[in-house]
C-alpha cells in the first residue's frame, strides 16, 4: 500500500509540522525541480515546506500565523473548463430555481459571483465544488441553493446500505459482532450519494454529539452506529430540541454513555444512577462548563473568573432523569448465527430505547434552578430536563461557535458568533433552535463570505480532505463492498475516521491551541491541529499518494476526466486550484507546482502512464500544500 513512502526522519523539513512551517515564514529559494530528480515524495516535501503563509509563498521574516495564507484569484478557471465533466454525479441533485426566475422583478437579482467565490462557499457547505455545482450556486445564489439542499430527500441510509449488502443478517462468520462493516458503511455514506450538504453537516454534528464505534461491542455494532448516523442525517435540518431528545434516547448513545440499563438508586446496596450521560449532555451537548454571553465570550464574576454553569449536585440530580431506559427487544426475533448460536435480529438498533417505569428513579430532581417533583413520570421528567437545557442562555452560543469552527473558521469573531446564536434563539419567526436557520446564518454570514484575513480559516480535517478527493475524482468500488477500514492510525492512515472518535471529547477540543507556536502567542484557536504532528504529516502524504494512484482496497478514484489536461500544465494546475482550493493557492505556489510538473517533458506521443503520473503528481502537490490544508 505504501510505496513511495515519505519517512518523517528522511528530511529535516518534514520533521516540522505543517503548522510550524506555515507560521515561521521561512525563506525557501525557488529552484527548478522535477519528478525525476526528486521523486514524488521529495517533491511533496519541497512543496509542503515552500508554499507557506502570506502573499509571497513563505516570505522571509513573515510573522503570519498558520492561518495567514490569503485566497488568491490568480489564474482563475471558468466553470466551463475542458474538465467540466469531472464528477458530474457527485454533487447534490436537488432542484433549484432557474437563473431567469431568480432575477425576475419580484426577486432580488442574484449577485454575479465569481467561480472562486462559489467554490469557496461550496467547500464550506459540503465536500466538493464541481463545475456543475459552481454553476448552480452562481445561477441562484447562496440562500436559494441552500434551501434546495435543505429540501432534498435522503437517498440510501446507512442501515439500508448494510441491509442491502448482507450485513444485517447473521452469518456463520459472526458478522453481527464485527464493527468493520460500520467503517465500510460510514465511508460509503460520505463518498457516495446525493445530499452532500446533509452529510457534511451531519459529520459536523457527529463531532459535537459524539458517539464512537470503537467501544461498541456485543450484537450489531455496525447497525447501531448506522442507526445513529441515520438519525443525524434525518434530523440535521430539524430543531435542536428534537435532536437533543432523539440522541438522548438513541440505542448507540445509550451504550456509549451508559443510559442503556441505567437503574434507579437502591438504598440497600448503595447503588446510585450512572452519571455519565447527565454530565456529558450538559458539558458537551448543550451548555458547556462556563456561562457565556450571546457572543460566546465567557461571563466573569467580580474577581474576573469564569462562572461555572453547573456543580456536582446538578449532575447527581439530572442522572435520575436518565434511568429506566434500555434497548427495545420487542420486535426482535432470534436467528441462528455462528454454530447455530441464537442471535437477536437488529431491529433494536434503530428508533428509541424503551422505558421501564419500575427501573426509573421516583426521587425529586433539582438542577440548574429547575425542580422536577418526586414521582413525576419518566416522559415528563425527560421533557422538563431537556427543555431546561434547550432554553438555557448558553446553548445557542455554545453550539453555534463550534459549528462555525467545523465549517468556516477556528476563530470566529464574537460578532459572528452572536449573529449565529441570535438565529438559534429566533429564526425570524419566533422559533428557537431551528437548525436550518443556524446553518444558513453560518454559511451566509459576512465573515464567511467576505475576504479572508490573517486569522481566518481552519485546518481541513483529514476526513474532509479524503472525502473531497474521493468525490471530486469520481471514486468507485470495484465490488460494491467499499472496504475502507478504520483509518485513525496516523502512521499509515489519516489519524481520523468517521464515527471513530477516541472518546466523547471528539478527535480534538474546540479550545485547543498548539503549544509553543505563533498561534499560541497570538491566542488563536486551532482545534484540528490537535491531530497534526510529524507522524500524521508523513502518514497523510503516504496515504493520499497511494490512494490517488492505486486506491484503497476495492475503492479507487478516477482521473479519466482530467486526461485532456495532461499536456496543458497551466490549465491542469489552475483547474485543481479552483476545484480543490477555491483559488486559494498563491501565485508563487502555483508557479512552483507548474515548474515541478514540466519535467519530464510530455508530448502527445508520450505514454499514457507518463501522462497519468503527471496528473497524480499534480493532485498530490496541491492537496499536500499548506495553502490547501488551511481552508479559508
Task: For every predicted segment, state its role.
Residues 107-155:
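N-terminal mature-domain "stem" immediately C-terminal to a signal peptide or N-terminal signal-anchor/transmembrane
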Residues 43-46, 138-141, 150, 162-168, ...:
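Active-site substrate-binding loop specific to GH73 endo-beta-N-acetylglucosaminidase modules
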Residues 1-37, 40-73, 79-82, 90-105:
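Bacterial Sec-dependent N-terminal signal peptides
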Residues 195-198, 209-214:
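Short, contiguous, well-structured surface segments enriched in hydrophobic/aromatic residues
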Amino acid at each position: 500500500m505504501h510505496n513511495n513512502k515519505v519517512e518523517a526522519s528522511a528530511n529535516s523539513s518534514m520533521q516540522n509540522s505543517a503548522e510550524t512551517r506555515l507560521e515561521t515564514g521561512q525563506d525557501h529559494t525557488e529552484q527548478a525541480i522535477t519528478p525525476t530528480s526528486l521523486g514524488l515524495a521529495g517533491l511533496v516535501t519541497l512543496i509542503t515546506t515552500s508554499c507557506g503563509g502570506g502573499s509571497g509563498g513563505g516570505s522571509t521574516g513573515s510573522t503570519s500565523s498558520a492561518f495567514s495564507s490569503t485566497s488568491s484569484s490568480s489564474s482563475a478557471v471558468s466553470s466551463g473548463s475542458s474538465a467540466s465533466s469531472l464528477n458530474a454525479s457527485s454533487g447534490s441533485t436537488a432542484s433549484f430555481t432557474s437563473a431567469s426566475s431568480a432575477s425576475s422583478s419580484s426577486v432580488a437579482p442574484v449577485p454575479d459571483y465569481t467561480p472562486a467565490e462559489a467554490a469557496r462557499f461550496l467547500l464550506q457547505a459540503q465536500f466538493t465544488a464541481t463545475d456543475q455545482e459552481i454553476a448552480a450556486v452562481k445561477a441562484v445564489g447562496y440562500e436559494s441553493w441552500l434551501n434546495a439542499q435543505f429540501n432534498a430527500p435522503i437517498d440510501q441510509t446507512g442501515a439500508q446500505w448494510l441491509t442491502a449488502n448482507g450485513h444485517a443478517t447473521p452469518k456463520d462468520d459472526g458478522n453481527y459482532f464485527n464493527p468493520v462493516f460500520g467503517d465500510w458503511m460510514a465511508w460509503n455514506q460520505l463518498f457516495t450519494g446525493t445530499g452532500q450538504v446533509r452529510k457534511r453537516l451531519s459529520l459536523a454534528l457527529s463531532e459535537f454529539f459524539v458517539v464512537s464505534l470503537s467501544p461498541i461491542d456485543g450484537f450489531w455494532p455496525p447497525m447501531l452506529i448506522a442507526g445513529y448516523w441515520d438519525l443525524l442525517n434525518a434530523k440535521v435540518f430539524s430543531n435542536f430540541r428534537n435532536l437533543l431528545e432523539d440522541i438522548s434516547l438513541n440505542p448507540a448513545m445509550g451504550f456509549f454513555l451508559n443510559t442503556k440499563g441505567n437503574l434507579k438508586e437502591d438504598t440497600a446496596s448503595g447503588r446510585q444512577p450512572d452519571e455519565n450521560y447527565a454530565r456529558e449532555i450538559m458539558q458537551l451537548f448543550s451548555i458547556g462548563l462556563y456561562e457565556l454571553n450571546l457572543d460566546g465570550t465567557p461571563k466573569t464574576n467580580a474577581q474576573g473568573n469564569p462562572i461555572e454553569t453547573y456543580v456536582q449536585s446538578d449532575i447527581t440530580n439530572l442522572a435520575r432523569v436518565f434511568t429506566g431506559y434500555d434497548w427495545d427487544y420487542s420486535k426482535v426475533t432470534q436467528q441462528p448465527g455462528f454454530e447455530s448460536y441464537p442471535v437477536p435480529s437488529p431491529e433494536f438498533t434503530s428508533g428509541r430505547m424503551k422505558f421501564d417505569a419500575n427501573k426509573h428513579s421516583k426521587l425529586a430532581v433539582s438542577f440548574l434552578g429547575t425542580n422536577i417533583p418526586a414521582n413525576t413520570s419518566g416522559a415528563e421528567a425527560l421533557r422538563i430536563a431537556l427543555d431546561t437545557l434547550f432554553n438555557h442562555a448558553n446553548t445557542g452560543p455554545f453550539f453555534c461557535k463550534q459549528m462555525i469552527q467545523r465549517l468556516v473558521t477556528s476563530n470566529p469573531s464574537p460578532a459572528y458568533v452572536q449573529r449565529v446564536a441570535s438565529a438559534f434563539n429566533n429564526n425570524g419567526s419566533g422559533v428557537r433552535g431551528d437548525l436550518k436557520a443556524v446553518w444558513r446564518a453560518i454559511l451566509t454570514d459576512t465573515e464567511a463570505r467576505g475576504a479572508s484575513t490573517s486569522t481566518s480559516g481552519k485546518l481541513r480535517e483529514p476526513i474532509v480532505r479524503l472525502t473531497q478527493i474521493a468525490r471530486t475524482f469520481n471514486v468507485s468500488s470495484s465490488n460494491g463492498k467499499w472496504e475502507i477500514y478504520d483509518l485513525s492510525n496516523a502512521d499509515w492512515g489519516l489519524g481520523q475516521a468517521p464515527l471513530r472518535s477516541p472518546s466523547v471529547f471528539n478527535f480534538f477540543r474546540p479550545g485547543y491551541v498548539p503549544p509553543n507556536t505563533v498561534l499560541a502567542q497570538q491566542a488563536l484557536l486551532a482545534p484540528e491541529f490537535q491531530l497534526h504532528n510529524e507522524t500524521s504529516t508523513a502518514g497523510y502524504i503516504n496515504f493520499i499518494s497511494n490512494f490517488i494512484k492505486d486506491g484503497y482496497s476495492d475503492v479507487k478514484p478516477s482521473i479519466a476526466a482530467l486526461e485532456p489536461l495532461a499536456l496543458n500544465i497551466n490549465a491542469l494546475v489552475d483547474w485543481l486550484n479552483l476545484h480543490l482550493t477555491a483559488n486559494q493557492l498563491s501565485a508563487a505556489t502555483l508557479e512552483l507546482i507548474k515548474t515541478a510538473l514540466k519535467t519530464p517533458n510530455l508530448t502527445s506521443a508520450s505514454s499514457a502512464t507518463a501522462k497519468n503520473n503527471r496528473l497524480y503528481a499534480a493532485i498530490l502537490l496541491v492537496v499536500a500544500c499548506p495553502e490547501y490544508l488551511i481552508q479559508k
